[in-house]
Amino acid sequence: MGKDSLATVILALMHHEPLDEIVYCEVMFDKEISGEVPEHRTFIYETAIPWLRRAGLNVKILRANTTYKECFTKTIQRGKGKGKLKGFPLCGRCNIQRDCKVRPIQKYMKSLPQDTQQYVGLATDEQDRLMRLQEKQISLLEQYACSESEAWELCHRYGLLSPVYDFTDRNGCWFCPNATLPELRHLYDHHPDLWREMLALQALPNKATEKFNRELRFSDYDILFHNEDAQLCWFTQ
């Protein structure tokens, strides 16, 4: 539930577009820990959802039957990686996005009337993604010529801008392989418990993938940030 999705809701209300309910799918790290950056999860449940409900909207919360950790530790059954743990998802081919977010939404959509239309939070300056919209998917941001920066302003005006946008211009799971360096640094500095969870997964043997993303292992980022802090400490002495 990022700025583009919330800006879509605001536009729908402003322009009296039909809107039956808000569907939010929460990706989970394990059965207890959310995949949302903690500050963002607090924003969703304590600010965004109450605001939506006060506006008279029904909010449907979905979760997949599987989690990031279960996908990570699942044993590959065939192919050259047979017998290994799946390990870190591949950038550009993220099985977590597919299994933990897309599938629950698709399953829920099948329970709705066939003519149900889905609003998707894609701004006018995301043309590559807009080109991939499927039948019965609509971007109100495109329809009302709203860019990503304008979506940011709209959410800010209505008190619906998540605090994660203080340190990143995107919204993703805290274990996402597309996470930027500032996002990872924020996790390292402010959520050491979650950081340790990822280091524990990195330490598991017999993984099909060892790198967290295209460039580095998660443990490499741990060394990087540790060295940065040590250097800063040396300069301040």
Predicted regions mapped to residue ranges:
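Nucleotide-activated chemistry modules centered on ATP-dependent adenylation/adenylyltransferase
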Residues: M1-Q237
